Structure formats: structure tokens, C-alpha cells
Amino acid sequence: FLKAALASGLALEAFPARSASQKSSEQLITIIDLDKCDGCSDLSIPACVRACRAKNQARYPEPQKPVQPYWPQPKYEDFSNDRDNISRLTPYNWIYLQHVSVDGKDIYLPRRCMQCFDAPCRKLCPFGAIDQTKQGAVKIDDRVCFGGAKCRDVCPWNIPQRQAGVGIYLKVEPKLAGGGVMYKCDFCA
């Protein structure tokens, strides 16, 4: 089962489904040879994670403190005190390596947004905050996102992650509206 799941996931990422009328010579894809990825076992931070963090560090959110809870629930998602966590996706870590072992072989799977060709998150966002470039990058506009997390709910991989204490809702109605902003890999678009 695990082998089939791994193969399916890679096939989905490398060869997104599209109709003949949707073909674009500008569409970008990522092909990763998992046989060559060793998880950068000799480094404290894998090279792909380090490169992503260096490229996007200026875009990471700086929440207003104290972070307000999501009304009417007394909770919120604040990763700002855990920015160095590279073991999962957060608003400060847009890619991580998942380690699995199949038949005694170690496999490292880069986990990040797959930039779905027909992205369900883009269709479902009630605020129209998600767009897709000609190159296929699925981008969340942090100036428009209210952090409703519908994109994460519909994402088959739960990729977008919310950071409270940032976003347009702070200007509109900080105690009643929204929950922050959703963040994810956008192909460095």
C-alpha cells in the first residue's frame, strides 16, 4: 500500500492532469528523484528547506501581539514562537522532508504544496485570495486572506497553514473577523 501511495503522490506532483485546451508551454513542474535524496543527513537542515527559508524569510508573517483568539472560540494558531520547527509545515516552514522506510529502504519525501493544476483551494476560497499564475504557481494573497482555512480543509494534503495576529482582519474588525492569514509554498513566484 505504501509503495502505491508514494508512487501516486509523485505521479500527481510530476504530471498534473489537464485537458487539451489547458496546455501551457509556461507550466512549471517539479521532478524529484527520490533515489538520490538522502534527506541531507549530513546537514542540520536539509538543503531544500534551507533554500526555501532563505528565499522566503522576508515574506514570513510578523504577528501583532497579543494574538486574539478566534471568535467565538478561545483558540488561535500562532507558530511565531516555533519558527525553527522544520519537522512540519508552518507559516514559517513551507517545505519539510518526511522520512519513511519501505522494505528496509529509507525514503525522504519533500512535502510542500503540489501546485495542483485545478487547485481546489483556489476554487473554494470565499475571499478570492488564491490565484494561479501562468506557470502554475498557486498563490495566496496575504493582503486579502482572512485566514478562514477553507483552503486547508479542501486540500488533500492539508498544506496551507494559518498564522494568527496578521492580515487584513486586523484593520477590519480584529476581535470578530478572520483568524489570520494562510501561508504555503508558491513555487517562489
Annotated model-derived regions:
Residues 1-189:
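Non-ligating segments of multi-cofactor redox enzymes
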